[in-house]
């Protein structure tokens, strides 16, 4: 479920959002997320929460862009995530702050161990459990007219997340995330929107656990790389760019459609070099659930390289 909270219609406080659900899939996965962005003190501060529990048997395909879909490897694991940050307003629409992150994986195992050839998971370093504990530092600027379904504005975020042994982490390592989104009416007189998204995820130092490496569909909303299954590509650095053309089909906005394309690249695990990229594209349907918050259901079908394809469903816009 998604809840959007704004105290009064003319209230200057930005809308807060809370997303919580629990689901059980046909692949015996249990997914329990709680995510929220709460604005405090007349927009002078914001509290960002991202808590999750996953029991998540899922497929990985190896490391780098040259991984083969035929070499799928089923991993089973349980995952507890606790990320909590508070940001303070520096200027209109600009916030900076920090917080704490905990990522704990346990009961990590291959469904079919000791197969030949040896999997990239085993080569990288098999670990049955990992603990990553550290600090987070954020700088963001958000001029979107609506954080759930923007018609105009931009969003930019820089996030640095060092994991530190003195906070209980198994090892010292560091990640950097750079994100930008933009929304523009096109044509200017229409209600159609061009939406752009850049999501980039880098390992700055150290050696993250295998399941904490940048990977397709493992962004905060599990949405990067439509056209490819989650976990299709994985390595130490990731570049992802996406574009959508959002078309209103009915005057009241109940129905809409989307044409989308994306391009992502992952560095080679040993050289850190980007050598190739994976394009994908597709189209989708939008069904409006709430005209005030603009919440909708997104149902997309995407195609990627090497025969990759599938449906992708989301509550709210993809980005």
What is each residue range found by the language model?
Residues 125, 135-250, 255:
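C-terminal outer-membrane beta-barrel translocator/porin domains of Gram-negative envelope proteins
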Residues 18-24, 49-57, 62-65, 98-104, ...:
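Transmembrane beta-barrel strands of outer-membrane/channel proteins
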Residues 5-7, 41-43, 89-93, 144, ...:
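Outer-membrane beta-barrel channels and translocator barrels
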Residues 3-7, 21-27, 54-58, 105-107, ...:
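Sequence/structural signature of outer-membrane beta-barrel proteins
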Residues 1-131, 136, 231-235, 294-298, ...:
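Gram-negative/organellar outer-membrane beta-barrel architecture
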Residues 30-34, 78-84, 133-137, 141, ...:
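Hydrophobic, lipid-facing positions within transmembrane beta-strands of outer-membrane proteins
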């Amino acid at each position: 479920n998604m809840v959007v909270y704004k105290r009064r219609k003319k209230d200057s406080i930005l809308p807060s959002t809370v997303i919580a659900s629990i689901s059980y899939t046909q692949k015996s996965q249990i997914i329990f997320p709680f995510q929220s962005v709460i604005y405090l003190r007349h927009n002078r501060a914001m509290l960002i929460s991202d808590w999750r529990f996953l029991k998540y048997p899922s497929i990985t395909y190896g490391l780098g862009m040259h991984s083969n879909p035929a070499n799928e490897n089923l991993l089973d694991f349980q995952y507890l995530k606790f990320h909590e940050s508070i940001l303070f307003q520096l200027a209109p629409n600009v916030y900076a702050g920090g917080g704490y992150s905990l990522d704990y994986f346990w009961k990590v195992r291959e469904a079919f161990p000791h197969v030949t050839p040896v999997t990239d998971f085993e080569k990288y370093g098999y670990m049955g459990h990992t603990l990553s504990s550290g600090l987070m530092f954020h700088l963001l600027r958000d001029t979107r007219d609506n954080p759930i379904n923007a018609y105009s504005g931009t969003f930019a975020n820089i996030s640095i997340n060092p994991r530190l042994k003195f906070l209980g982490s198994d090892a010292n390592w560091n990640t950097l995330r750079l994100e930008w989104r933009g929304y523009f009416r096109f044509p200017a007189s229409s209600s159609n929107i061009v939406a752009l998204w850049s999501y980039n995820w880098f390992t700055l130092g150290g050696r993250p656990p295998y399941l904490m490496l940048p990977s397709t569909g493992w962004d905060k909303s599990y949405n990067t790389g439509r056209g490819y299954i989650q976990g299709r590509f994985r390595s130490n650095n990731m570049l992802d760019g996406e574009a959508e053309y959002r078309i209103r089909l009915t005057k009241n906005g109940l129905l809409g459609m989307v044409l989308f394309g994306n391009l992502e690249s992952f560095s080679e695990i040993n050289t850190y070099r980007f050598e190739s990229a994976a394009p994908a594209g597709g189209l989708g349907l939008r069904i409006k659930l709430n005209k005030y918050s603009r919440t909708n259901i997104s149902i997309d079908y995407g195609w990627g390289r090497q025969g990759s394809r599938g449906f992708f469903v989301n509550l709210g816009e993809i980005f």
